Amino acid sequence: MTEKLVIRKLGNAEKARVPEAQKLRDATTYNPVVPAKQFGFIHNNMDCIGCRACEIACKDKNGLAPGPRFRRVMYIEGGSFPDVFAYKVNMSCNHCAEPACLPACPTGAIWKRKDNGVVDIDSTLCIGCRRCEATCPFGAPQYDPSDNLVKKCNMCIDELEAGRKPYCVSAC
């Protein structure tokens, strides 16, 4: 589907904002935003007990329906007796230096904050085409069929701006 066909799904107010958002998307694709400081998550696997409180806190904070999970705790097991292994992997958006999802968005809804490097989605510009979901190697953008939008971790940006920790971190 071409960008023009995709953009037809937006309302008039959102359509008016698309050219500027696309211009920003194109500029940051070829000249990535270098934030003043880059926020990210560091997960200490030794401290994690696999309780998934971080997942629940994230779903509560973001009002997510069953299905999408911005924070995911997965278990990796393998080997054969007596040489077995098991560990937990805690995944969310990596807020990449050069996010693959950003140039994939036809409306420019995905953007990277200059002050802290958090990659975010403007839900008023998202049309739910799922291109970002297909390009992210980490599975961060996730489609929410209840809104027909793609959503992802934004590090609880409202909490960070208020001087607090993201919900997943506080719940751990």
Question: Which sequence ranges carry the predicted segments?
Answer:
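Non-ligating segments of multi-cofactor redox enzymes
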Residues: 1-171
